Amino acid sequence: MSGPSFSGAGMNFRITVWCAAAAVWSSGALAQDGAGQAAPGTPDKVYSTTGSAPAKPGDKVYSTRSAQAPDPQADAVKERFAQRFEGFDVTAVRRTPYGLFEVQIGTDLLYTDEKVTWVMEGPLIDALTRRDVTRERQEKLSSVPFEELPLDLAVKQVKGDGSRVMAVFEDPNCGYCKQLHRTLEDMDNITVYTFLYPILSPDSTTKVRDIWCASDPAKVWKDWMVRGQRPPTAECDAPVDQWLALGRQLMVRGTPAIFFKSGGRVSGALPRDELEARL
């Protein structure tokens, strides 16, 4: 029997459906019969936007979980899943209306049966409406009220009347981020808030500090991302820890990560027509 293959915190099952044999793993306690409610989430893991330490009273924080009513059967599924796949932080397990349990790990969604004998990864399609239920759920779970983003920590760029608004997490060494900037060059009437997110290479932190501490961060940022002009050295107390903490809270694993005023988000650079449609 082939087993699963994982890659980092963002787990990647290479096999869509596989069997976890009961002879190999012992099952957990039998679950009580629930009434179809969603499972409870464990306490939120939150970080302050004013530092890299756990949040203190009064700090702005973002939840990575939604409030859920108790469901003992889903709790039992979560316990069994944790026993069989040690080392993975299961965000929540929820009962679905189609006879499976939804297992959330960060922004990833998997599906399993009550005994965690089978695990499925991939899009779940509503056969009647042809809707991608998995994608809809991921978008809902990862949505963030735009007005709650700490935009004072972002580099602000305005074109035209600035009426269309989006926020982006970007690393200065991100090729796809530079591709996004080339797309934005052809667009008008837009405001872009950039959260500098140095995660890709050792000198990313140096570059974001030089950009943030410049006399005109928006110009220096554009000169680097569009024209390849390296930022001049600058010194100040750049909020690097706050950027990284915010990204962790919002489960940003790569760049660019685009947040729209509607509350939706997209990972990756979009072609112009798709970007226009979302703004």
Curated annotation (Swiss-Prot):
Chief localization: periplasm
UniProt region (Disordered), positions on chain: 33-73
Bias (Low complexity): 33-44
Signal peptide residue numbers: 1-31
Subcellular location: Periplasm
Disulfide bonds: C174-C177, C213-C236
GO CC terms of this entry: periplasmic space
Matches recorded under PROSITE patterns: THIOREDOXIN_1 (PS00194)
Keyword list, A-Z: Disulfide bond, Periplasm, Redox-active center, Signal
Taxonomy, superkingdom: Bacteria
Annotated Gene3D superfamilies: Disulphide bond isomerase, DsbC/G, N-terminal, Glutaredoxin
Protein's job: Required for disulfide bond formation in some periplasmic proteins. Acts by transferring its disulfide bond to other proteins and is reduced in the process. Necessary for extracellular secretion of the pertussis toxin (PTX).
Homology family: Belongs to the thioredoxin family. DsbC subfamily.
Name of the protein: Probable thiol:disulfide interchange protein DsbC
